[in-house]
Regions:
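Short, low-complexity, Lys/Arg-enriched N-terminal segments of secretory-pathway carbohydrate enzymes
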Residues: 1-26
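Short beta-strand scaffold segments in enzyme catalytic cores
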Residues: 122, 126-134, 425-430, 498-500, ...
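Short, small/polar residue-rich loop motifs at catalytic or cofactor-binding pockets
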Residues: 302, 421-424, 446, 494-496
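Noncatalytic scaffold domains of N-terminal-nucleophile
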Residues: 25-27, 42, 46-95, 99-265, ...
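Extended C-terminal subregions enriched in glycine
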Residues: 470, 490-491, 524-525, 533-582
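Single-pass alpha-helical transmembrane segments
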Residues: 31-44
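Active-site rim segments in enzyme catalytic domains, especially the processed small/beta chain
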Residues: 116-120, 126-133, 137-141, 290-291, ...
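Internal maturation/activation junctions in enzymes
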Residues: 59-63, 241, 245, 252, ...
């Protein structure tokens, strides 16, 4: 499998290393970062969630001129870097590296932190995909800890009651987060297990600050805002309102106790120890069908990733299905032979044409996605080899009409439709020994299934909503994808695609991934294209307003910032357009060359990067 070189265009990352000669002190950088995060988060909330005097959403027109760069920082480091959705979690991961922890150690420590400080998106009640690269071996691995359907699940269990797949006790898959972390730690961990959890346990004493994102989500998430444990943590009884951003709150005592037991007894205790007994009691009381055997029998998979050779000798590593790594590769394969460069987006006509081609590639790739599912239940080896091959990409590219689009999903090869997925958080890590980790984790919808378990204090996922169910024909007359139907022990298809690019000498070049549900795959593709083909810095690539097309519904979703003339150009080719008002996708990317590591955390969520010089 070969894709045209994605690194032929020199970027401004490569040209500007002046900040290496006079680095800021870490404390100063953290203070500045926090101030910037608060400023941006407040501005975004006021923009995206702003209300008119009458209480109706305000919708400013699409801009005529391009937006100014965000206030996020383009960081440079000499040795190592950790990028997360929260500055404190990045610092925790960096501190683990400074203690001679491995890249996996740093990732696990940041995951536990993110599971608290971004508890609306991920946590120990969810699951993940992880790509690990070990420099000494010159080899990459995929860790698949996606949640599984309980043994008592049936293909039609949500017939006539689809909301039960999204909220409440029947929405849970068997959580894989902790067993997946434990499996990765057993193989690549270096520091004591408890030391990876202690920095997060410290928040049980000191408390943590409510982020803008957490505040936004708790105020709108159905059911979750009424949960007694979440309200005890996040609700101010004096004002009768949720605590505003910046307020210091403490985690629940139940959650702190659970985390302490995991630290003391190891990751398996949640699956076959005292915590497992308590969790099953919680779930039975709530009405879940997850059993003690479901927990005991859950296994995280350590397997080979999809490995795609680039024409210059670089290699892209990304997880196999049920992740969307194959979809990402398919997008890049389709676009590879266009030989995009910085000139491809110079001038209005070129920019419109290039975006049109990218959007068409998205549509073809999301048709491919409708046939993907859990490879433990489907033999997809031949299909994956085909859709990730250069020849398949060329054949699809030849079908793209530069002048007009189609609004028929069947035209692009869709034989069914896929469910949307939601939520997620991403972590990217580069260690000073050359190892790297790209990790995307999720509890699916904001605050998962909308409640916290009584004894164990865990926010459980609602991953069952990511499965397709028979009998729901969409507006195009397409049936849901059978590849993603529910079966006991099966993992649902996901948009997550944590990826690592390594050069021909075995050195990590790019660690990238995203949060944002169904928009994840296109966001990763867009940022990679902008960085590696258009020659932008990682900050420029992440800052740029993004667009997304998932074939169904038949519209380009775009965020504020795409200019009116570009949108008019796309509409003239027959595209429908819809502007979304939420944060969309959130990207964390680390890029390394011979000079430095260049890193940026997406301004849309207020994360940051910490590193070592």
């Amino acid at each position: 499998m070969t894709i045209r070189s994605m690194t032929v265009t020199e970027s401004r990352d490569d040209k500007d290393s002046s900040c290496l000669n006079g680095p800021y002190k870490l404390k100063t950088k953290l203070i500045i970062s926090v101030l910037i995060v608060l400023f941006i988060a407040g501005g975004l909330t006021g923009y995206f969630l702003g209300l008119t005097d009458k209480g109706k959403p305000s919708e400013p027109p699409d801009p005529v001129l391009r937006l100014r760069p965000s206030a996020s920082l383009l960081h440079t480091f000499k040795k190592a870097a950790v990028c997360t959705d929260n500055p404190a979690c990045s610092e925790i991961g960096r501190n683990i590296l400074q203690q001679n922890g491995s890249a996996v150690d740093a990732t696990i420590a940041a995951m536990f932190c993110n599971g608290l400080l971004n508890q609306q998106s991920m946590g120990i009640g969810g699951g993940f995909f992880m790509t690990v690269y070990i420099r000494e071996e010159g080899k990459a691995y995929s860790v698949i800890a996606r949640e599984t359907a309980p043994a008592g699940a049936t293909v039609d269990m949500y017939s006539g009651q689809p909301d039960k797949a999204r909220f409440g006790p029947l929405a849970h898959g068997v959580p894989g987060e902790v067993r997946g972390m434990w499996a990765a730690y057993q193989r690549w961990g270096r520091l004591p297990w408890a030391s990876l959890i202690q920095p997060t346990l410290d928040f049980c004493e000191t408390g943590f600050n409510v982020s803008q994102v957490m505040y936004d989500m708790i105020t709108v998430a159905p059911y979750a805002k009424d949960d007694p444990i979440l309200r005890r943590q996040l609700f101010d009884t004096k004002t009768n309102k949720f605590h505003p951003p910046g307020t210091t709150v403490k985690p629940s005592a139940e959650w702190c106790r659970t985390l302490k037991i995991i630290a003391e007894k190891g990751g398996d205790d949640l699956y076959n120890g005292t915590l497992a007994v308590e969790l099953i009691d919680d779930l039975k009381k709530a009405g879940s069908i997850i059993t003690a055997d479901d927990l005991k029998n859950y296994k995280a998979k350590v397997t080979d990733p999809i490995a795609v050779k680039l024409a210059n000798g670089d290699t892209l590593y990304t997880p196999p299905p049920p992740s969307s790594g194959a979809v990402l590769v398919n997008i890049l394969n389709i676009l590879s032979s266009y030989n995009f460069t910085a000139d491809s987006i110079k001038g209005l006509d070129n920019e419109v044409l290039t975006y049109h081609r990218i959007i068409e590639a998205f549509k073809y790739a999301y048709a491919v996605r409708t046939k993907l599912g859990d490879t433990d239940f489907l033999d997809l080896r031949e299909y994956i080899a085909n859709i990730t091959s250069p020849q398949f990409g060329i054949e699809v590219r030849q079908k793209i009409n530069d002048n007009v689009t189609s609004n028929d999903p069947v035209y692009y090869g869709a034989e069914g439709y896929s469910k949307d997925d939601h939520g997620t958080a991403h972590i990217s890590v580069m260690a000073d020994n050359g190892d790297a980790v790209s990790l995307t984790s999720s509890i699916n919808y904001y605050f998962g299934a909308g409640y916290v378990t009584e004894k164990t204090g865990i926010i459980l996922n609602d991953v069952m909503d990511d499965f397709s169910s028979p009998g729901f024909t969409n507006q195009f007359g397409l049936q849901p994808s059978p590849a993603n139907f529910i079966a006991p022990g099966k993992r649902p298809q996901s948009s997550m695609c944590p990826s690592i690019i390594v050069d021909k000498d075995g050195n990590v070049r790019l660690v990238i991934g995203a949060a944002g549900g169904t928009k994840i795959t296109t966001a990763v593709a867009l940022v990679a294209i902008r960085k590696l083909w258009f020659g932008e810095t990682v900050k420029e690539a992440i800052d740029h307003p993004r667009f997304h097309h998932q074939l169904i519904p038949m519209t380009i979703y775009y965020e504020f910032g795409l200019t009116q003339d570009i949108l008019d150009g796309l509409r003239s080719k027959g595209h429908n357009t819809t502007r979304y008002r939420d944060r969309g996708s959130i990207v964390c990317a680390l890029y390394k060359n011979k000079t430095a590591i260049y890193a940026n955390s997406d301004f849309r969520k207020g994360g940051d990067v910490a590193g070592m010089d």
